[in-house]
């Protein structure tokens, strides 16, 4: 009889980040500003890459997809978060929660593998310069971009299916600001041990596999750089890798902290603050990192500005 009286959950409610009005106002303004910069920066990067023939190289082909993924991952979280900040009830439907989890997980997973593809591209450019055009042909580049999307689909579909096959019949309040898998599993009526193991194993496998590709690539790059005789040559080689290393360090450090460490190490409130960083801030940082520290991107931007203000023939 008790089982029949249990209420099946049809929607979820978020606790959000704060209940204080002034903090809500500051949070809304900050997130809105960061989101607009994210959209403008990443869309501008994509437009610049596709409009400038000098940037039609494998490195910028990958970077355009990274910008697309960053823009989409932020858009799967930020608009809903902005709407919820001043809402009395921060609600989301059962299927809406599943969709948000799937799309965000898909784009974040894709980004991890894209960064690995970009590391391999840097390896071939520095360690195998004479074979670069052969090793990084158009066909290879397409495979190195399609692969991350496919692996990410398999990964997040597994997590989302396992999570939403669990019964939710008790509390429907998620201690978070979006449908993340870990706080959602804590609401399940059934034992979610299998889900947590799968989450730990798959997240760890993605991190280890893509991380190993990045580490091996950069160890080989460093060994090659140390063999370069001229200081200018070394500086040029380092400059081509510094932006990518910065992006890798920020994203992987944050994701490992959230998903791979033991779940009891830190409170959900700390997790929420760190999640805010990687859901909203990191997508904004990548175009800034790659544009401010890349001479070719800055050169392409200057050419566009000069062409607009000083068109030929005037």
UniProtKB/Swiss-Prot annotation:
Task: List the GO cellular component terms.
Answer: membrane; plasma membrane
User: What is this protein for, i.e. what is its function?
Assistant: Potential odorant receptor.
Q: Which UniProt keywords apply?
A: Cell membrane, Disulfide bond, G-protein coupled receptor, Glycoprotein, Membrane, Olfaction, Receptor, Sensory transduction, Transducer, Transmembrane, Transmembrane helix
Q: Does the keyword Glycoprotein apply?
A: yes
Per UniProt, subcellular location reads as: Cell membrane
Q: How does it sit in the membrane?
A: Multi-pass membrane protein
**Which species?**
Mus musculus
Q: What protein am I looking at? A: Olfactory receptor 5G29
Please name every pair of cysteines joined by a disulfide bond in this record. Answer: 97-189
Q: Which GO terms describe its biological process?
A: G protein-coupled receptor signaling pathway; sensory perception of smell
- Mind telling me which residue stretches traverse the membrane in this protein? 26-46, 55-75, 100-120, 134-154, 197-217, 238-258, 272-292
**Similarity comment:** Belongs to the G-protein coupled receptor 1 family.
> What ranges does the Extracellular topological domain annotation cover?
1-25, 76-99, 155-196, 259-271
Q: What InterPro entries has UniProt attached to this entry?
A: GPCR_Rhodpsn, GPCR_Rhodpsn_7TM, Olfact_rcpt
Q: Which residues does the annotation flag as glycosylated?
A: 5
Q: Which gene encodes it?
A: Or5g29
Q: Which residues lie on this side of the membrane: Cytoplasmic?
A: 47-54, 121-133, 218-237, 293-312
- Pfam families, sorted: 7tm_4
In the record, what terms sit under GO molecular function? Answer: G protein-coupled receptor activity; olfactory receptor activity
């Amino acid at each position: 009889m008790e089982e029949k009286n249990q209420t099946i959950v049809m929607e979820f409610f978020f606790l959000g980040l704060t209940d204080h009005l002034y903090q809500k106002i500051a949070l809304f303004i900050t997130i809105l500003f960061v989101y607009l910069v994210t959209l403008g920066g990443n869309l501008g990067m994509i437009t610049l890459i596709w409009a400038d023939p000098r940037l039609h190289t494998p490195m910028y082909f990958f970077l355009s997809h990274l910008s697309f993924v960053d823009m989409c991952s932020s858009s799967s979280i930020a608009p809903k978060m902005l709407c919820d900040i001043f809402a009395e009830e921060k609600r989301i439907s059962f299927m809406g929660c599943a969709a948000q989890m799937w799309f965000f997980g898909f784009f974040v997973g894709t980004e991890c593998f894209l960064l690995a593809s970009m590391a391999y591209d840097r390896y071939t450019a520095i360690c195998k310069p004479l074979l670069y055009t052969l090793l990084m042909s158009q066909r290879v580049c397409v495979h190195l971009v399609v692969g991350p999307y496919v692996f990410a689909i398999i990964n997040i579909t597994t997590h989302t299916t396992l999570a939403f096959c669990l019964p939710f019949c008790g509390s429907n309040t998620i201690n978070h600001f979006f449908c993340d898998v870990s706080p959602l599993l804590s609401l399940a009526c059934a034992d979610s041990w299998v889900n947590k193991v799968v989450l730990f194993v798959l997240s760890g496998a993605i991190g280890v596999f893509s991380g190993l590709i990045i580490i091996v690539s950069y160890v080989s790059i460093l060994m090659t750089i140390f063999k370069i005789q001229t200081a200018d040559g070394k500086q040029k080689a380092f400059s081509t890798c510094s932006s990518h290393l910065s992006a890798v360090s920020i994203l992987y450090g944050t994701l490992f902290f959230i998903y791979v460490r033991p779940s009891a190490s830190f409170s959900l409130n700390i997790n929420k603050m760190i999640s805010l960083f990687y859901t909203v801030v990191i997508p904004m940082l990548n175009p800034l990192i790659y544009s401010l520290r890349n001479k070719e991107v800055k050169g392409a931007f200057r050419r566009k500005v000069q062409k607009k203000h000083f068109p030929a023939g005037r």
